């Protein structure tokens, strides 16, 4: 939970409130969050809390304070009408000055560990993200579905830091005509990133909103955090953090230590069997009773490749074991067969800050069933242990399952 702080306006006209959220470590780079037209409501506070979980000192200023302090609106018809009325009356120049005051406020806070400050804005805040990039010394400014930016392109030459803009293809507030003006003007500027999300509408990143689109939201969030990390951090050794998590899963087999590497509400999904859990309680139960103490004693993981991004680790590996016990998460309900199994696997592991947020683990379940004798491969386009062997030895023949492969021998290329 965050707290409210009071900030002095740079023009001496008064003070305004801002919601402040701190990371678990108590310190981190500073980020100003630009509100939607609905004020510093529960959604914007949740955004600040999310950025705090990512490792930032996040500050959401009340940018309507000169009109009506403490605006906190929902999303019904009356609230929307009120929000539009406030947006039409706000002095955006003064709002940018307030953002500059917030940037300076963060720099002066002992919790902020980097002189560079970021800005992330949504809707009205998305427009202000562009203005913050052109009029302040913000190190990285990220705007989601800002409107009317096309009318401000003469300021583009003043951009000094990194600018990231997320556009929604179906956004009536920033339609194709507007984007046709914005994109050619900005795309070739240094440290400028422009992203278009097909098939989504304005406010696609508002969790729980009528236009919320989870895939677009996740992709945009990853790009936003990556841009912030490039300019102001924080930078964590995600590879080492993932290794520590796996060590507790398979070596120390310590449930508490495993859970300690994860966020407060983690999510694990073994995709072929839909096993895992959501949240501390369910996932702790899963790890304790169905995973950590339920794996064969000879289970090993052989790493093949690892890709480390801004927020996630993608691991390619081969798992080997003797099917000497029932493995609830991998072969639920299947008695031990005593067969030795080799499985090519892929893990997509996402982090928030220095804690693991989710795991998506993929493998070919048909290949596993072939190896333990529960699926006859004859006449089916499936492979058994050959899949793992081919992953480790590229010289093994390809296309053995393609009946028509021989027919193309000698044909033109």
Predicted regions and their residues:
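N-terminal cap/leader regions of alpha/beta-hydrolase-fold enzymes
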Residues: 1-258, 266-267, 272
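C-terminal and inter-domain tail/linker signature
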Residues: 169, 205, 209-413
